[in-house]
C-alpha cells in the first residue's frame, strides 16, 4: 500500500466528514428515536419516572457511549484495520493464524451481526412512522397501528426493491441529510436542556452507578437492556472503516457524540417537565413544538431509511467476505455501481426483506421490537473483544495488559448481555434463532470444506507430465479443446487432486495443446490481484496461483486473459495462431473450463457426522450460486464433472455368477 494511500486513509477532509455522517452513523444516530421511550415504558410510564431515574439513565447512556463506543471502537478497534478495511471478518483475517479456534468467535460475531441487521430497518422505520401520532393533523390516522405497519412495509418494500440499482446518485444525499439530522438533534436537545440545566449533572458517573442499585429503578440491572440501545451502532462504525477512512471517523465522531448526547439530555429535560402530565407520546417527538413535528417525522424517516440502507449494504459486504473466506455458501453477486465496494446479493436482499417484513408484522409496534432488539449485537461485541485481545498481542502489547484491557470491556459487554438476555422471552428469540440458523450454515460449510481437504488425495504433476505430453501429441484422439482449464481449490507446488488427473487421463482422455490448473487463493488484503505461474519446465502445462483479495470478484476468465497475454509476450507460452477467426491476427485458441465436483459416496472412511455434514452441504448447494456463475464462467465453455469424494474404498459386494447349464447337465 502506497504512503499516499495510507496518508489519505488517516486524513480528514470536509467531504469525507460529510460522507462519514451518511455511511457510518445511521444506526447509532437513529437510536435517540427509541432509547428514551424504551426506558420510560419499561419504568411503567411517565408517572413512574423520578429525577434520579432520569439523571441516572442519561448518565448510563453517556458513559456507555464513552467506554464502549469511544474508547473500545473509535480509539482501539479502528487501529485494527486490515489494509484499511474494518469489521469482524477483517479483524479475523489479521489474527486467524494465531489460533485455529478463532474461527468460532468470527462465525458467532458475523452471524449475530447479520441477524441484527434484519431487525434494525424494522425498528428504525417503525419508530419514525409512529412519530406521526404526535402530529395533530395526522394523529387520527396513525393512532391506528395498522396504518403505521402498512406505511412501514411500503417504505421497506421500496427500499429493498431499489437495491438492485445501487445507491449511486441518491447515496450522495445521505451525508447532507444526516448532517441536518445531527444538527437538529443537537439544537433541539440543547434548547430543551436549557430549560432544566440540572440534567447536565448526568455527566457525573455517580448517577449511573447509583441508579443500578436504587429502588427508584424498577428493573434493576435489567435497565441496561434499554441503555444498550444507545450504542448498538458501534459495531457498524468499525465495519464501515474502509468506506470513509480512519481520519474522517476520528474527525466526525466528536460532533456526532455531542449531538446524540444533547438529544438524550433534551428528551430527559422534557420528561422532567412533563412527568406528571400523563402524556403518552414518544419523548423524541413530543419534545419538539407541534408545528415542527411533521418536519421532524419526515427527517426522522429519511434518517431511518439511510440507517437501514447502511445496514443492508453492510450485510452484503459481510456475506461477500464470509463467502470468500469459505465459511458461507456462494451466492450470486452483482455490482450495480461504478466501484467494487458497491455490491448487491439478490438472495440476501430478499431474505432480509422477508425477515424484516415478518418482524414488523409479528411485533407490530416499535416498543415490542425494542424489547427484542440488542440481544444479538451484545454477542457480536463480545466476539469482537475476543479477537481484539489477540490482535493487541500480535501487535506487541504484553499479553497480560491486553488481556486485562479486553477483560474490562468483556465484563461490561457481558453485563449488557445478561441484562439483554431477558429480552429472549420478549421476542429476542427471533433474532437468536436467526443467528443460530446462520451459524449452522457457516459451520456446515466450513466443516464440509475441511472434510474434503482431509480425504481428497493429491498426485504430483511431474510424475504424469510425460503421459500428458504423449496425450497432447496423440492424433488418435480428437482435440478436446486448444486450452483446457481445471479450477481447483487445492494445489501446492506440483501437487493437484487425483480426480483432476483421472479426468484428463482416465475418464475420457482429453487432448489439448495446453493444460491449465488454476487455484484461486483469497488473501487477507481486500483488493489484491496478483498471480504466480509454474510451467514445470514445459510449454503445455501451466499451474497458476491466482491471489485475489477477499473483496475482489473471482471472475477467472478475465484474469486468465491477461495471464495468457503475459506468458505469450514473454515467450514462455507458444502462440496459438487461428486459421479461422473474425479477429485478424488472433493468436490465442479456444478455452474450456472444467470444474470437478466431489459428491459423497458410501465409503467406509466417512463417519456418521462427516456424512451428515457433507449431505447437508450438498442440500444447501441447491439454493446457492453455481461454480459457473461464481467464477464468471456463464459466458464461457464450461463443464462440471461429478466424482465421488472417495475413490479408493469401494465396497466389494458379494455376488455369485450363475453358470448356464450344458446339454449333458439338462439331460
From Swiss-Prot:
The keyword Signal does not apply. Disulfide bonds: none annotated. Pfam families: K_trans (PF02705), K_trans_C (PF22776). Its main location: membrane. It catalyses: K(+)(in) + H(+)(in) = K(+)(out) + H(+)(out). It is found in: Cell membrane. The chain crosses the membrane at residues 16-36, 58-78, 101-121, 146-166, 167-187, 221-241, 253-273, 294-314, 343-363, 373-393, 399-419, 424-444. It comes from the Bacteria. GO terms for molecular function: potassium ion transmembrane transporter activity; symporter activity. One of its GO terms (cellular component) is plasma membrane. InterPro entries: K+_transporter, K_trans_C, K_trans_N, Kup. It is a multi-pass membrane protein. Transport of potassium into the cell. Likely operates as a K(+):H(+) symporter. Belongs to the HAK/KUP transporter (TC 2.A.72) family. This is Probable potassium transport system protein Kup. It comes from Streptococcus equi subsp. equi (strain 4047).
Amino acid at each position: 500500500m502506497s504512503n499516499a494511500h495510507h496518508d489519505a486513509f488517516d486524513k480528514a477532509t470536509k467531504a469525507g466528514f460529510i460522507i462519514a455522517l451518511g455511511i457510518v452513523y445511521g444506526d447509532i444516530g437513529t437510536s435517540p428515536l427509541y432509547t428514551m421511550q424504551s426506558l420510560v415504558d419499561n419504568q411503567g410510564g411517565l408517572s413512574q419516572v423520578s429525577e434520579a431515574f432520569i439523571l441516572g439513565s442519561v448518565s448510563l447512556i453517556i458513559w456507555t457511549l464513552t467506554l464502549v463506543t469511544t474508547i473500545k471502537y473509535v480509539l482501539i478497534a479502528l487501529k485494527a484495520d486490515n489494509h484499511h478495511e474494518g469489521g469482524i471478518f477483517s479483524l479475523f483475517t489479521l489474527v486467524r493464524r494465531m489460533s485455529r479456534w478463532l474461527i468460532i468467535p468470527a462465525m458467532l460475531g458475523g452471524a449475530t451481526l447479520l441477524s441484527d441487521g434484519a431487525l434494525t430497518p424494522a425498528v428504525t422505520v417503525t419508530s419514525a412512522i409512529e412519530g406521526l401520532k404526535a402530529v395533530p393533523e395526522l394523529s387520527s390516522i396513525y393512532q391506528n397501528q395498522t396504518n403505521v405497519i402498512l406505511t412501514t412495509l411500503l417504505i421497506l418494500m421500496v427500499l429493498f426493491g431499489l437495491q438492485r440499482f445501487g445507491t449511486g446518485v441518491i447515496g450522495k444525499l445521505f451525508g447532507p441529510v444526516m448532517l441536518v439530522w445531527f444538527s437538529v438533534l443537537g439544537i433541539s436537545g440543547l434548547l430543551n436542556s436549557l430549560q432544566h440545566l440540572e440534567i447536565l449533572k448526568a455527566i457525573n458517573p455517580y448517577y449511573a452507578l447509583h441508579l443500578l442499585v436504587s429502588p427508584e429503578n424498577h428493573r434493576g440491572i435489567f435497565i441496561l437492556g434499554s441503555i444498550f440501545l444507545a450504542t448498538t451502532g458501534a459495531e457498524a462504525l468499525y465495519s464501515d472503516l474502509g468506506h470513509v477512512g480512519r481520519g474522517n471517523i476520528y474527525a466526525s465522531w466528536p460532533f456526532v457524540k455531542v449531538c446524540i448526547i444533547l438529544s438524550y439530555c433534551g428528551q430527559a429535560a422534557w420528561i422532567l417537565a412533563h412527568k406528571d402530565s400523563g402524556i403518552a407520546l414518544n419523548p423524541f417527538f413530543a419534545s419538539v413544538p407541534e408545528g415542527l413535528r411533521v418536519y421532524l417525522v419526515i427527517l426522522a424517516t429519511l434518517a431511518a431509511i439511510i440507517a437501514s440502507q447502511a445496514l443492508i449494504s453492510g450485510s452484503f459486504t459481510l456475506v461477500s467476505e464470509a463467502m470468500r473466506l469459505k465459511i458461507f455458501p456462494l451466492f450470486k453477486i452483482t455490482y450495480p455501481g461504478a466501484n467494487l465496494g458497491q455490491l448487491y446479493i439478490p438472495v440476501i436482499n430478499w431474505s432480509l426483506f422477508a425477515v424484516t417484513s415478518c418482524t414488523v408484522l409479528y411485533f407490530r409496534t416499535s416498543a415490542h421490537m425494542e424489547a427484542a432488539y440488542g440481544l444479538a449485537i451484545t454477542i457480536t461485541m463480545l466476539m469482537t473483544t475476543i479477537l481484539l485481545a489477540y490482535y493487541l498481542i500480535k501487535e506487541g502489547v504484553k499479553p497480560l495488559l491486553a488481556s486485562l484491557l479486553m477483560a474490562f470491556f468483556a465484563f461490561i459487554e457481558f453485563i449488557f448481555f445478561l441484562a439483554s438476555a431477558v429480552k429472549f422471552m420478549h421476542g429476542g428469540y427471533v433474532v437468536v434463532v436467526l443467528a443460530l440458523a446462520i451459524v449452522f450454515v457457516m459451520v456446515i460449510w466450513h466443516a464440509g470444506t475441511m472434510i474434503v481437504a482431509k480425504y481428497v488425495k493429491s498426485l504430483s504433476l511431474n510424475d504424469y507430465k510425460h503421459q500428458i505430453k504423449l496425450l497432447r501429441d496423440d492424433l488418435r484422439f480428437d482435440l478436446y479443446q486448444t486450452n483446457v482449464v481445471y479450477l481447483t481449490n487445492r494445489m501446492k507446488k506440483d501437487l493437484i487432486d487425483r480426480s483432476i488427473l483421472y479426468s484428463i487421463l482416465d475418464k475420457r482422455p482429453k487432448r489439448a495443446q495446453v493444460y491449465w490448473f488454476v487455484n484461486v487463493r483469497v488473501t487477507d488484503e481486500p483488493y489484491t490481484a496478483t498471480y504466480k505461474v509454474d510451467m514445470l519446465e514445459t510449454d503445455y502445462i501451466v499451474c497458476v496461483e491466482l491471489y485475489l483479495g477477499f473483496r475482489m470478484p473471482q471472475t477467472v476468465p478475465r484474469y486468465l486473459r491477461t495471464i495468457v497475454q503475459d506468458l505469450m509476450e514473454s515467450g514462455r507460452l507458444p502462440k496459438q495462431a487461428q486459421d479461422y477467426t473474425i479477429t485478424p491476427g488472433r493468436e490465442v485458441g479456444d478455452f474450456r473450463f472444467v470444474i470437478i465436483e466431489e459428491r459423497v459416496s458410501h465409503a467406509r472412511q466417512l463417519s456418521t457426522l462427516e456424512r451428515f455434514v457433507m449431505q447437508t452441504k450438498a442440500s444447501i448447494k441447491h439454493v446457492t450460486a453455481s461454480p459457473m456463475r461464481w467464477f464468471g464462467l456463464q459466458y464461457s465453455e464450461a463443464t462440471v464433472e461429478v466424482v465421488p469424494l472417495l475413490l479408493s474404498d469401494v465396497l466389494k459386494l458379494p455376488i455369485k455368477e450363475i453358470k448356464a447349464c450344458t446339454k449333458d447337465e439338462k439331460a
